Amino acid sequence: MLAGAEFTLYKNADCTDEAVKGITDDNGNLLFDKVEVGTYFLKETKAPAGYRKLLDPIKVEFKCVDGKHVFVVNDVVIDGNNSNENYSMTVENDWYIGNMTVINERGAKLPATGSKGTVLLVGSGIALCLIGLNKKRKNNKGEA
């Protein structure tokens, strides 16, 4: 459950025609209320500190197939027969509700810079270069 993630539902694949946006609550839930039948693209527009945004939008459709309302996620039909832990569809008070879990991952931890180890490595590299130059200089004097 991730609070503070911002998602936008777009009407086109280019994610330029905004339908509705919202921010996840303290429990990590977000409700887009009374969305019309159609095809949308869900994009994470802002991730909380320390987390990465989703790379690609998620295609979401609300439509009727053979007289049944269905919820379609990335071209996979979700109905009462094939719900799983990430996607499901329920009916409450004649409203069809598509439920979806979006997994956010923490950003990669960056290595520490400027540490004592870095100074030691750079110092060792410089020392080796100086030793090599000194040897070359001595060899050149011996040939003359």
Give residue spans per PLM region.
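Solvent-exposed loop/turn and edge beta-strand elements of beta-rich ligand-binding domains
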Residues: M1-A144
